Amino acid sequence: MLPVYQEVKPNPLQDANLCSRVFFWWLNPLFKIGHKRRLEEDDMYSVLPEDRSQHLGEELQGFWDKEVLRAENDAQKPSLTRAIIKCYWKSYLVLGIFTLIEESAKVIQPIFLGKIINYFENYDPMDSVALNTAYAYATVLTFCTLILAILHHLYFYHVQCAGMRLRVAMCHMIYRKALRLSNMAMGKTTTGQIVNLLSNDVNKFDQVTVFLHFLWAGPLQAIAVTALLWMEIGISCLAGMAVLIILLPLQSCFGKLFSSLRSKTATFTDARIRTMNEVITGIRIIKMYAWEKSFSNLITNLRKKEISKILRSSCLRGMNLASFFSASKIIVFVTFTTYVLLGSVITASRVFVAVTLYGAVRLTVTLFFPSAIERVSEAIVSIRRIQTFLLLDEISQRNRQLPSDGKKMVHVQDFTAFWDKASETPTLQGLSFTVRPGELLAVVGPVGAGKSSLLSAVLGELAPSHGLVSVHGRIAYVSQQPWVFSGTLRSNILFGKKYEKERYEKVIKACALKKDLQLLEDGDLTVIGDRGTTLSGGQKARVNLARAVYQDADIYLLDDPLSAVDAEVSRHLFELCICQILHEKITILVTHQLQYLKAASQILILKDGKMVQKGTYTEFLKSGIDFGSLLKKDNEESEQPPVPGTPTLRNRTFSESSVWSQQSSRPSLKDGALESQDTENVPVTLSEENRSEGKVGFQAYKNYFRAGAHWIVFIFLILLNTAAQVAYVLQDWWLSYWANKQSMLNVTVNGGGNVTEKLDLNWYLGIYSGLTVATVLFGIARSLLVFYVLVNSSQTLHNKMFESILKAPVLFFDRNPIGRILNRFSKDIGHLDDLLPLTFLDFIQTLLQVVGVVSVAVAVIPWIAIPLVPLGIIFIFLRRYFLETSRDVKRLESTTRSPVFSHLSSSLQGLWTIRAYKAEERCQELFDAHQDLHSEAWFLFLTTSRWFAVRLDAICAMFVIIVAFGSLILAKTLDAGQVGLALSYALTLMGMFQWCVRQSAEVENMMISVERVIEYTDLEKEAPWEYQKRPPPAWPHEGVIIFDNVNFMYSPGGPLVLKHLTALIKSQEKVGIVGRTGAGKSSLISALFRLSEPEGKIWIDKILTTEIGLHDLRKKMSIIPQEPVLFTGTMRKNLDPFNEHTDEELWNALQEVQLKETIEDLPGKMDTELAESGSNFSVGQRQLVCLARAILRKNQILIIDEATANVDPRTDELIQKKIREKFAHCTVLTIAHRLNTIIDSDKIMVLDSGRLKEYDEPYVLLQNKESLFYKMVQQLGKAEAAALTETAKQVYFKRNYPHIGHTDHMVTNTSNGQPSTLTIFETAL
């Protein structure tokens, strides 16, 4: 497997000195690089040794294993929370010291503020001692400010690192578990859920560690502040504290509500992403069936449910933020109202000491403490989900490969097993056989007989309920549905083994890959995409076989690898690979190609999980056993087979084989892009994920807001925000004005003037109450409105993006891996739903507060404006300088995240293969390497933001110093109330200013998600689904197809895959399309369905296909695809997504394809929910469902795209027979590799390198010994060629000379005039 990245730069933090660590100077070189050019992956610093994924994962895994053991001994349920606490409590507890010092400094600050204001209240210009003392107080105040600036960021840096470590360790454990899941456990989870654990649930750990310490710091600080307030204003402080205490349960109640909404939302999100995954996976089929609208409705409904929950949780969040915004105002209001009503007199120093003390405790108690509760409750939900996953059954290590101790063999004795413990009928029953080195055991049987299950039993994937399986020797396994992972072709074959040129060349040759590698530009160093997009199914199958052969194992389990390739290659693989290279090995081959049975040492015939017959080929012939009847399903009527056949399924999904039958679900981020293109020589290059550079454009903001509401709403929103902020400042100003009036009065009174004036309490209190109520109301209104608009915007953009994806051409899906598209729908939409509205509102609130603070300071001491200018310039430069680097870091973090998910989903698809090859450890290492790469980016993301924040707080500290010392210098001109207002505001600026700027950068970073979504709302579109010009409803009633000089390519400027094709297909004609892999057979279908726009003209019943809408065209043709695709949902939805048919019609269609009984046995019959991708049906059964769809559509044109490759001959025969019966009056095009499928066609179309080489009746073509078709038939061997020629001849005479009686349907073996048994079961091939 590929190394993920080269050795990176050593981390400068390791050698940094104390000063450098405190001020993050060690990051300066990185910022310089970021300023000069765009940052790339190799600019990132390597992960610190203690942060490596493997180290962290194994450490936590150790504690979890101990916890599981402890729980088993005490007969309890193990607790993941306990394991986490045991692992991390020491290192995390130390960080509490930071919190303690920081929160103490916040409490000390107001005391010294009070002393400074006191100096102003008792101002005496002659008292120099008082002035010096005041300067001393100002110095202590600034010292506290600086300590806060430094400590705060060190604390945050360390707790965020702790969160990262916990997340990385947890991901390591989840992946490790995924590799060990038993098949029963696989039924209880889905790929979507596991990806969700990895993308959403573990992110809660990053957040919970930040706030956790405030669970004890909050209450402690509240007690200290109460004590200080009591000394300052006496009993009135209890009124304020009471309000604070009332707010807390309110907030925790919000928290609980929020967490329950969160888990409900998560269920809907899971369902939406799972369905999205299926849509992207099966997009080709959805387009060919013209089912986009049905899926659009499905996703829209899921999204509506999700959004309604999101809106409700957003309202809660809005209320929460609003209460935070106005909490301090309400508290101060209640405190001073009580204070005044109790008859006390307010003074400036008391007012502002109280305001500042409340300010300190307010942050902790109303923001950090509830956040801690909310995050802890969210984390608990996530830990529960992860714990449930970690406790799923693991695969038993019982009959994993035993040491070969010299004797190598596979021995199965009286083996019985169930996939589903609840089911009554066993999957396999009473099997016994032994295979020794040098033997080839062929396993045959009808669809669903248990052939793949037998292999899984040998692999140890299917645990016995009775009997035993002993395997001596190393296993190599080739799955029925080929699995490749992202990496080079060579790394896919080597799969961790050392490269030995000679052996490698030999394997490449035996697996018929030599020619393919020559066609690829980079040969075996070509990088295969996420789903093997650059390879055709046939190539993938051969790469899988090559991987197995190169392993040089003792035992080979081959699950029908020959059906994915054409006859010639199939023979090459069988003779050179299976019979030669593997001739000394133990080989078990599941196959439907009965012509190879002669070479088998033993043949095992399975039916309904039981062994019907076992013996050698000659024994079978002697006993006169009719293979044909053995391979029949019981409910088939016995009749002489016509000449059926099996086109092959070249490109299959990556998932485990049809064995997962009767399971409720299984991994399925699969290669749904049925590359119906013959990508053999049309490499589709995977485009690099875009990382747009530089600033997020103004256009993105405009589109984002316009998606949310009308511009009038926006003007209203701006006014509302301004009103809220003005009310906020006025409330404080009024208090300082009142205190000033009171102190002037006191001075007058003390000065011995007339004691006639008394302040009108009602007037001052009335205005004060009015301003407080206004602040609260405006705050709530603005919060709710912002959330409503932004969530609405997210909904609109999601719908636009989804619509755009549905209308995108197939090429888009070939160029973009599933993970990348899904990332837009999961991560980016998650940001738009959840984080962006919150961050945005937070940013607006803090921005307005910062503006308020500066305005007040300038109003009080106008000359402050002078030093503000350079500070402002430094700030603007700093922000620009920081964002240049931080944007790149954030983008790198996004792009290094994708491979983690891709690797997980790819591993889940190839789970059996990985386990068979014992490659779990290698995959785990690769996963850890992907995680480390992501950690490098994440670590920079954390540290760069701290670097910036420390510098911002330095600017604020300067501002506080200027205000404090400036007011002392100008003491003559100022009164106490003004100084109190300016200084208390300046102190709040400390944390708030850097938070505001960071939130502005955060908003900009999150706008990247908006950009990414908007980018997908404007994709290149296919032609419209419907035009004004609609074809007549009965069109096409004839089914005549004319190709007139058709050229076809998959991408503009790409190579032509069809060249100057001209052909006429008459009404009701049956046409077989043949050619080597890569000849353009599937491209012909793509051109017909306009999956890409063809050049030239294609007419169907005198209507030009390019002149009508795509849906009008595609709905009128039925296709039975190579790849049987079923979707989650009911069987009814799968057959008839638009509810166009009655129940009777649906049951009849199922009866026709002999699935009626199977469906009737399901608990909900036709309304039973299918598992993810229909995995509770075997591949053969899924193919029959596709046939039922075609029967229901009753179209005049049917296209069969190699549809019966991995079904047994009998099912194949059933499909062929139904096609003959049901579609006798239709035009049928069949792409085939197996020539006997199409030998009885009216015409054969032979394609080669995209050109039409021959087009005539099969018998006519066979008369010409120079024809390509003749050569193809001859390659099958004499007996087969003779049989095919005879069939073609009979069909030819029957069609052209019906008066000559050709009744003899039986092909006779010329040697003895007897019907040949071989021919009987070969006809099915």
From Swiss-Prot:
It catalyses: ATP + H2O + xenobioticSide 1 = ADP + phosphate + xenobioticSide 2; an S-substituted glutathione(in) + ATP + H2O = an S-substituted glutathione(out) + ADP + phosphate + H(+); 17beta-estradiol 17-O-(beta-D-glucuronate)(in) + ATP + H2O = 17beta-estradiol 17-O-(beta-D-glucuronate)(out) + ADP + phosphate + H(+); dehydroepiandrosterone 3-sulfate(in) + ATP + H2O = dehydroepiandrosterone 3-sulfate(out) + ADP + phosphate + H(+). It is found in: Basolateral cell membrane; Apical cell membrane. Residues 657-667 have a biased composition (Low complexity). Its cofactor is Mg(2+). Changing Y556C: 40% reduced expression level compared to wild-type; higher transport of 9-(2-phosphonyl-methoxyethyl) adenine than wild-type. Changing N746Q: Does not affect plasma membrane localization; 1.5 fold increase in PEG2 transport; does not affect estradiol 17-beta-D-glucuronide transport. ATP 1 binds at G445, P446, V447, G448, A449, G450, K451, S452. Gene3D superfamilies: ABC transporter type 1, transmembrane domain, P-loop containing nucleotide triphosphate hydrolases. Changing N754Q: Does not affect plasma membrane localization; PEG2 transport is decreased by 50%; does not affect estradiol 17-beta-D-glucuronide transport. Pfam families: ABC_membrane (PF00664), ABC_tran (PF00005). GO terms for biological process: bile acid and bile salt transport; cAMP transport; cilium assembly; export across plasma membrane; leukotriene transport; platelet degranulation; prostaglandin secretion; prostaglandin transport. GO terms for cellular component: apical plasma membrane; basolateral plasma membrane; external side of apical plasma membrane; Golgi apparatus; intracellular membrane-bounded organelle; membrane; nucleolus; plasma membrane. This is ATP-binding cassette sub-family C member 4. It comes from Homo sapiens (Human). The gene is ABCC4.
